[in-house]
């Protein structure tokens, strides 16, 4: 709940509402006291199985002052069994629609014979970003983007820049003498990898074909001209080179890069 940003200020409330102390059911009860119709909201929360939100979830630090009194391990002297809690996955705010699988949370797991999680070597975190089209549609019409000729290409550029900056910040967050390793992977990283494998080095390709040509000629060449097949090897290498060139030309013709 502490990782969830956002603060709401309501009339009559001295403290701002945050996820660490927001109880949806208690909030609806307060709305009922001022004769506010909450039937549709109650139905929505019940269908999504929101309940008390994060208020009835275990705290990582039971002695934390912000740990709600409704937490099952409030003021407990024992640390929570995180492995048991994460075994099989865990739930977000909605127990019906926000279930995070165990494979998306931890890695390098060790389990007992019953499949219960005992320990893990890595903690995983995932951020789901908008697609360029979704981001363009979301901010279209905002005054902040009117002066930059807002379009999908600019949205894609912003998403790419954010991912690159995120990777850089993550790598800088770990001290050099730390025993822990932080690995980051984004769609931009995947695109860079694919691009690096797609780039064709003329020197490397030419060197490779020259080596193939020399190998084919030397292995098939004989001193006896009647038994020598060096020309066949030369023709075979040239045929392969022309086939590859034709394939690349066809890909370029149909727009595959």
From Swiss-Prot:
Keywords: Glycoprotein, Membrane, Receptor, Transmembrane, Transmembrane helix. Glycans are attached at residues 75, 114, 177. One of its GO terms (molecular function) is hedgehog family protein binding. Glycosylation is necessary for SHH binding. It is a multi-pass membrane protein. Residues 201-257 form the SSD domain. GO terms for biological process: negative regulation of smoothened signaling pathway. Residues 1-199 are extracellular. It is found in: Membrane. One of its GO terms (cellular component) is plasma membrane. Induction: Activated by Sonic hedgehog. The chain crosses the membrane at residues 200-220, 236-256. Residues 221-235 are cytoplasmic. InterPro entries: SSD (IPR000731). In the eye, detected in neural retina, iris, retinal pigment epithelium, but not in lens. Acts as a receptor for sonic hedgehog (SHH), indian hedgehog (IHH) and desert hedgehog (DHH). Associates with the smoothened protein (SMO) to transduce the hedgehog's proteins signal. Belongs to the patched family. This is Protein patched homolog 1.
């Amino acid at each position: 709940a502490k990782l969830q940003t956002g603060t709401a200020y309501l009339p009559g409330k001295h403290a701002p509402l945050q996820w660490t102390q927001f109880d949806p059911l208690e909030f609806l009860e307060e709305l009922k006291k001022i004769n506010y119709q909450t039937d549709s909201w109650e139905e929505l929360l019940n269908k999504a199985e929101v309940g008390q939100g994060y208020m009835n979830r275990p705290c990582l630090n039971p002695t934390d002052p912000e740990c709600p009194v409704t937490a099952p391990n409030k003021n407990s002297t024992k640390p929570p069994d995180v492995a048991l809690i994460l075994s099989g996955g865990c739930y977000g705010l909605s127990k019906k629609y926000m279930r995070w699988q165990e494979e998306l949370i931890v890695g390098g797991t060790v389990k007992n014979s019953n499949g219960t999680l005992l320990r893990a070597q890595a903690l995983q975190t995932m951020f789901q970003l908008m697609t360029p089209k979704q981001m363009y549609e979301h901010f279209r019409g905002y005054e902040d983007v009117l002066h930059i000729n807002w379009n999908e290409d600019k949205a894609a550029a912003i998403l790419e820049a954010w991912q690159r900056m995120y990777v850089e910040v993550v790598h800088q967050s770990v001290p050099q003498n730390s025993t822990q390793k932080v690995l980051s992977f984004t769609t931009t990283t995947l695109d860079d990898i694919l691009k690096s494998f797609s780039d064709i080095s003329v020197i490397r390709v030419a060197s490779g074909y020259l080596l193939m040509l020399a190998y084919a000629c030397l292995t098939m060449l004989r001193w006896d001209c009647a038994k020598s097949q060096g020309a066949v090897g030369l023709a075979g290498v040239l045929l392969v080179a022309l086939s590859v060139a034709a394939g690349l030309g066809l890909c370029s013709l149909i727009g595959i890069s």
